[in-house]
């Protein structure tokens, strides 16, 4: 068996796994920004039906902060999620089980940090995440 792709789920899909009802049309994934890992991520996306992922070169993916793949669903591959780097996100990630598949998901703290963009929707998300953190009695 080959190596597994290294990633952490971010964005609204991560918020949903934490228990919010935030709607979204995309999947935000923070990846370990190495060429080898980007190859594994692109291969995994291709295997799951996102054939457009096969058209991207791993070198291209790691050379920029975000790569958008596909349309429905749209997958946004991040090499940095605003101020959050992969190593710190991976170290603090919480794994959720989604239909038998373990999904490494950004901590509430890292979700909040990734939402400090100044956009109105992100400001609203921060309020929801801070309330969720309070309800779960998380630091």
Feature names for model-found ranges:
Residues 1-139:
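Compositionally biased terminal segments of proteins
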């Amino acid at each position: 068996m080959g190596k597994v792709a290294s990633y952490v789920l971010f964005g609204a899909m991560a918020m949903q796994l934490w228990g919010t009802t935030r709607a979204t049309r995309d999947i935000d994934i923070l990846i370990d920004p190495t060429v080898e890992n980007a190859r594994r991520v692109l291969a995994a996306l291709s295997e799951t039906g996102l054939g457009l992922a096969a058209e991207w070169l791993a070198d291209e993916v790691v050379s920029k902060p975000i790569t958008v793949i596909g349309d429905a669903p749209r997958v946004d591959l991040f090499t940095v999620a605003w101020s959050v780097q992969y190593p710190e996100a991976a170290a603090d990630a919480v794994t959720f089980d989604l239909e038998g598949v373990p999904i490494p998901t950004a901590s509430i703290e890292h979700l909040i940090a990734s939402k400090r963009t100044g956009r109105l929707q992100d400001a609203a998300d921060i309020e929801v995440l801070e309330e969720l953190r309070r309800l779960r009695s998380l630091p």
